[in-house]
A protein has these predicted regions:
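Active-site nucleotide/adenylate-binding loops and adjacent lid/helix of ATP-dependent enzymes
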Residues: 3, 23, 27-31, 35, ...
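Conserved metal-phosphate-binding beta-hairpin within the catalytic cores
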Residues: 239, 248-250, 303-335, 345
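ATP-binding N-terminal substructure of ATP-dependent carboxylate-amine bond-forming enzymes
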Residues: 5-8, 12, 18-157, 161-163, ...
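Active-site "cap" helix and flanking loop/linker of ATP-utilizing ligase/carboxylase catalytic domains
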Residues: 260-312, 343-367
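Phosphate-binding site of ATP-dependent enzymes
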Residues: 216-297, 318-325
Length: 367
């Protein structure tokens, strides 16, 4: 572990507290939605809600899609309610989004559930616990900017950039961040060049490895395209990097300890990400000091070239030669009990509840 690097982070952690509001805040933890990561978001939101409630704040866990239909919405922060009561565990398959949409037949007229904007405007800050397209594509952030709502995480521009894997790869290449060779392909197009097998086919806009399929031959390639196109009209096809998988949180522009993720079976897909016991996660990762510093520098550079703000998490692969590649940035990293960023923070001595508070502090620092 690089003591000087992490000492600087801990100083920033202490410094961020100086910007903390003296009064207890009204906080909306915004979760749910209708992306394939709905369940992940709700469990993240539940953890954040409990942590901030324990800090003494007035906190509401609010589903961005289902909202709050009761007439007493103006007084929700005064209500003594356990807002987590309806949140269950993450299942090992994608949530039934059609069933969720059926709960609100009018959803096409307005994505936001009843009184979501009204309640968020009452809050001092909205903690963005959303994952997937609905929360990470920048549209909600832009709407909040127009409505004077303060929120955690990065802004709408960098959110939109990072949601698109193809654009992110272009910026990585331009900014000197190593990334796997790949091409983009729209539905109905024929690629000009073929990425050699094995390759990975990814929905261009998606997360939690939903719509990500590996192909070893023509038959698997055709099936992978069919699967990925279920989630997006554009896909990214890139070289498969055989080796070790890592993730690096970047908070306030500084890289956190690296964590290595080793799935017990298969690769780091939706099930392995969120089911306890599906992966072996090692933090800090067992890497040389030189390799650690180089990967952290690449994570910080990726943060810059994608014009990110406040915090994010970068995913890497290292091949058998020891060369590493940045796969993508996660603008709203998972905050579930098995999530990576909280594990990285804990190595620095930052407990989960303090991390939640820190992410609020740095996001509100310019206020």
């Amino acid at each position: 572990m690089q003591i000087s690097h992490f000492s600087e982070i801990l100083k920033e952690f202490a410094h961020a507290g100086r910007f903390r509001k003296e009064f207890k805040m009204k906080i909306v933890v915004l979760a749910g939605g209708i992306s394939t990561e709905r369940d992940v978001s709700l469990v993240s939101g539940m953890g954040i809600y409990k942590a901030l409630k324990g800090k003494g704040h007035q906190v509401m866990l609010l589903d961005v899609f289902l909202g709050y239909a009761n007439e007493d919405w103006k007084n929700v922060f005064e209500k003594d309610v356990d807002w987590t009561a309806s949140v269950g565990a993450i299942k090992d398959q994608n949530p039934d989004i059609d069933a969720v949409k059926a709960l609100r037949p009018d959803w096409k007229k307005n994505f936001f559930g009843p009184h979501v904007i009204d309640i968020c405007q009452q809050a001092d800050v909205v903690f963005m616990a959303l994952h997937g397209e609905n929360g990470e594509n920048g549209k909600i952030q832009a709407c909040f900017d127009l409505n004077g709502i303060r929120y955690t995480g990065t802004d709408y521009v960098s959110s939109a950039i990072c949601m698109n894997k193809a654009i992110s790869k272009d910026l990585f290449a331009a900014g000197g961040v190593p990334t796997p060779v790949g091409i983009r392909l729209k539905k109905g197009e024929t690629p000009d060049v073929q990425v050699p097998y094995p390759c990975v086919v990814k929905a261009c806009c998606g997360g939690s490895s939903v719509g990500v399929v590996m192909a070893n031959n023509d038959e698997e390639y055709a099936a992978a395209l069919e699967e990925a196109f279920k989630y997006d009209d554009e896909v990214v096809i890139e070289q498969y990097i055989k080796g070790r998988e890592f993730s690096v949180g970047v908070v306030d522009g500084k890289a956190y300890p690296i964590i290595e993720i080793a799935p017990i079976h298969g690769f780091y897909d939706y099930k392995n990400k969120y089911q306890a016991g599906s992966t072996i996660e090692t933090c800090p990762a067992e890497l040389s000091e030189e390799k650690t510093l180089t990967m952290q520098a690449a994570a910080e550079q990726a943060f810059k070239v994608l014009r990110l703000k406040n915090y994010a998490r970068m995913d890497f692969m290292m091949d058998e030669k020891g060369d590493f590649y940045c796969l993508e940035a996660n603008t709203l990293p998972g905050m579930t009990p098995t999530s990576l960023l909280p594990q990285e923070a804990k190595v620095l001595g930052i407990e989960y509840a303090d991390l939640c508070q820190l992410l609020i502090d740095i996001s509100m620092r310019d206020e």
